[in-house]
């Protein structure tokens, strides 16, 4: 169905063709490429070698029965909505990606449809409710 895999910074990784993923990360303009599968983009071999976590200090991997991951930079949660779910964005923003099902999100003034593989962002200070039968990935800082 789906897996939650935490890949900490400094971990060399690749994404297989045809794979769908949600990539939650600390905001950064830096991506170091050590191989690019035949694409003609800049490589960063030396810089990559300087930041690789060779000792595996930053533990990552598949998270069985995933419900919540908290890092110093972001939090990711799996939210199962069976009828309704209410929340408040007390700081920054909330992001939801629908991984299964359909529903709607409303702040009392507007309603947005939520469909599989769609993402919605909710700004700070908004009280909102989600209605439907959905599995969501919620991300926030």
Residue ranges and their predicted role:
Residues 1-6, 107-125:
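Short acidic-glycine-tyrosine-enriched beta hairpin
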Residues 81-108:
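Glycine- and acidic-residue-biased ligand/ion/polar-headgroup-sensing regions
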């Amino acid at each position: 169905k789906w897996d939650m895999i935490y890949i900490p910074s400094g971990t060399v990784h690749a994404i297989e063709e045809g794979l769908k993923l949600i990539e939650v990360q600390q905001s950064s303009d830096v991506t170091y490429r050590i191989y690019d599968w035949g694409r003609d983009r800049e490589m960063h071999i030396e810089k990559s070698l300087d930041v690789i976590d060779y000792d595996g200090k930053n533990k990552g991997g598949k998270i069985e029965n995933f419900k919540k991951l908290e890092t110093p930079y972001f939090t990711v949660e799996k939210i199962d909505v069976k009828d309704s779910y209410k929340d408040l964005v007390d700081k920054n923003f909330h992001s939801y990606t629908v991984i299964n099902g359909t529903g709607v999100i409303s702040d009392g003034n507007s309603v947005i449809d939520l469909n599989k593989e769609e993402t919605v962002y909710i700004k700070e200070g908004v009280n909102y409710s989600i209605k439907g039968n959905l599995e969501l990935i919620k991300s926030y800082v």
